[in-house]
């Protein structure tokens, strides 16, 4: 085990000099005793002359030149397997929930090759989420990748919590949650929400919050992914939740300049597409088991053309776009049914009835969107009878796309609803065909199935 010395510290980037014949390889872990703490560094570049440039996985405060650094001769390794379920860990796989050791039987390196082309498998099977707007407009595939796009405060984390709760209770699968650069409060809420829903023993939690150094946030997604890969390789169908993939990119941007790389567009790292690819190519399903991933993607300044969300788009099967405009109408989940897409929305996959219903809903909402300008200038009375009917149905559809969530019961005061796909299709088909034209539009707001809307109308 070779020993080196620190020669330079710039923020999160630390240069270490080793003997010429024992230079650590790229991505190997190094350890340095910093006061009472043991700090782990990860090698990023070999600069020549025995010097390696590393990223610190913790705070580099208190480091100084001349400190001894040990080469561990392997990449960062984290616990995997069933022992991680119900536990909160950090980027190094150390427990942070004060419940003692993980007691794992196996540790895996966080840097691994993606499965080969022969091992991959694709599935056409749908994953029912119980959320109407998602199941109808942008259905998820088992073993697929989903992105939740949205600006600040439109409900990405709440949507993700609801998905975990529904899938854990209705499908009883294992989940891994990687919290990348998000608020500590959200991590805390999340843990308590999972405990209250009695699904904590099916979820492994890996956190690297906003206050952590960039090296930590850059690697915590890989830690979570490694745990998910282990479950997949045991032949299970596992869910991987990443909140938030943008912070992973941002952490790369923060260290990129310190590593001496030229910035590219908007100041992002020049290796943006490659870094995203390395992570995304590993999130995949093999012939042994599947990883279905749901990734929250923060959209800076609500601009979907920003390089970070734009790079993420390319890797996804389904995109759920959350809109501030819909949130401002009080319709939650604030999913934009015209912007959200899914590769699965194909009559050969979902069936003709589902496909026709989804496209019908989109065309009615699109027509309403076009008529809004006329209504704003001339008022409703100037519309033809046909258009008035379209507007009335569109407004009902818009309200019916809202739904009370289990994880948001404290905010909404109404009990959560899980809606089966067949009920969702039946409801929207009925509204489109005019079966519910006689009901007031308030009846459709914040209900589960269409039968509840009919009941609610009787009380209005």
Swiss-Prot record:
Pfam families from the xrefs?
A: ATP-synt_ab (PF00006), ATP-synt_ab_N (PF02874), ATP-synt_VA_C (PF22919)
Which residues bind ATP per the record? 150-157
Complex formation: F-type ATPases have 2 components, CF(1) - the catalytic core - and CF(0) - the membrane proton channel. CF(1) has five subunits: alpha(3), beta(3), gamma(1), delta(1), epsilon(1). CF(0) has three main subunits: a(1), b(2) and c(9-12). The alpha and beta chains form an alternating ring which encloses part of the gamma chain. CF(1) is attached to CF(0) by a central stalk formed by the gamma and epsilon chains, while a peripheral stalk is formed by the delta and b chains.
Where is the protein found, in the record's own terms? Cell inner membrane
Reported EC number(s) for this entry are: 7.1.2.2
Task: Report the function annotation for this chain.
Answer: Produces ATP from ADP in the presence of a proton gradient across the membrane. The catalytic sites are hosted primarily by the beta subunits.
Which Gene Ontology molecular function entries are recorded, alphabetically? ATP binding; ATP hydrolysis activity; proton-transporting ATP synthase activity, rotational mechanism
According to its record, what are the GO cellular component terms?
A: plasma membrane; proton-transporting ATP synthase complex
Top-rank lineage group of the source organism:
Bacteria
Q: How does it sit in the membrane?
A: Peripheral membrane protein
Write down the top EC class of this protein.
Answer: translocase
Lineage here is: Bacteria, Pseudomonadati, Pseudomonadota, Gammaproteobacteria, Enterobacterales
Alphabetical list of SUPFAM superfamilies matching this protein: C-terminal domain of alpha and beta subunits of F1 ATP synthase, N-terminal domain of alpha and beta subunits of F1 ATP synthase, P-loop containing nucleoside triphosphate hydrolases
Catalytic activity reported:
ATP + H2O + 4 H(+)(in) = ADP + phosphate + 5 H(+)(out)
NCBIfam families annotated for this entry? atpD
Q: Which InterPro entries match?
A: AAA+_ATPase, ATP-synt_VA_C, ATP_synth_F1_bsu, ATPase_a/bsu_AS, ATPase_alpha/beta_chains, ATPase_F1/V1/A1_a/bsu_N, ATPase_F1/V1/A1_a/bsu_N_sf, ATPase_F1/V1/A1_a/bsu_nucl-bd
Q: What is this protein called?
A: ATP synthase subunit beta
Underlying gene? atpD
Give the UniProt keywords, A-Z: ATP synthesis, ATP-binding, Cell inner membrane, Cell membrane, CF(1), Hydrogen ion transport, Ion transport, Membrane, Nucleotide-binding, Translocase, Transport
Would the keyword ATP-binding be found if you checked this record's keyword annotation? yes
| Family stated for the protein in its record | Belongs to the ATPase alpha/beta chains family.
């Amino acid at each position: 085990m070779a020993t080196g010395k620190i020669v330079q510290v710039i923020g999160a980037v630390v240069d270490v000099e080793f003997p010429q014949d024992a230079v650590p390889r790229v991505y190997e872990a190094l350890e340095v005793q910093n006061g009472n703490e043991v700090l782990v560094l990860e090698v990023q570049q070999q600069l020549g002359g025995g010097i390696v440039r590393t990223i610190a996985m913790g705070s580099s405060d208190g480091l100084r030149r001349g400190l001894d650094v040990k080469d561990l001769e392997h990449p960062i390794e984290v616990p995997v397997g069933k022992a991680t379920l119900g536990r909160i860990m950090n980027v190094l796989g150390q427990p942070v929930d004060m419940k003692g050791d993980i007691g794992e039987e196996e540790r895996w390196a966080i840097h691994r090759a993606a499965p080969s082309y022969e091992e991959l498998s694709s599935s056409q099977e749908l994953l029912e989420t119980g959320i109407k707007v998602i199941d109808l407009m942008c259905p998820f595939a088992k073993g697929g990748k989903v992105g939740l796009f949205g600006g600040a405060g439109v409900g990405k984390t709440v949507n993700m919590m609801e998905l975990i709760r529904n899938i854990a209770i209705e499908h009883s699968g294992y989940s891994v949650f990687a919290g990348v650069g998000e608020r500590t409060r959200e991590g805390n809420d999340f843990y308590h929400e999972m405990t209250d829903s009695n699904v904590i023993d099916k979820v492994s939690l890996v956190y690297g919050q906003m206050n952590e150094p960039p090296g930590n946030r850059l690697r915590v997604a890989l830690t979570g992914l490694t745990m998910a890969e282990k479950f997949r390789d045991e032949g299970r169908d596992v869910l991987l939740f990443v909140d938030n993939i943008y912070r992973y990119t941002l952490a790369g941007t923060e260290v990129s300049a310190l590593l001496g790389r030229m910035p590219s567009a908007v100041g992002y790292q020049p290796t943006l597409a490659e870094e995203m690819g390395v992570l995304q190519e590993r999130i995949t399903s093999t012939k042994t088991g599947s990883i279905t991933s749901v990734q929250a993607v923060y959209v800076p300044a609500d601009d979907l053309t920003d390089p970070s969300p734009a790079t993420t788009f390319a890797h996804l099967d389904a995109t759920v776009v959350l809109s501030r405009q819909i949130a401002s109408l009080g319709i939650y989940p604030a999913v934009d049914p015209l912007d959200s897409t899914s590769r699965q929305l194909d009559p050969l996959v979902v069936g003709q009835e589902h496909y026709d219903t989804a496209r019908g809903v989109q065309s009615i909402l699109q027509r309403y969107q076009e008529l809004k300008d006329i209504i704003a200038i001339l008022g409703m009375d100037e519309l033809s009878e046909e258009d008035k009917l379209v507007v009335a149905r569109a407004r009902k559809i818009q309200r019916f796309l809202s739904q009370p969530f289990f994880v948001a019961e404290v905010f909404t005061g109404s009990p959560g609803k899980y809606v089966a796909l067949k009920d969702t299709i039946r409801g929207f088909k009925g509204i489109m065909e005019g079966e519910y034209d006689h009901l007031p539009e308030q009846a459709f707001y914040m209900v589960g199935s269409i039968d509840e809307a009919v009941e609610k109308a009787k009380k209005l």
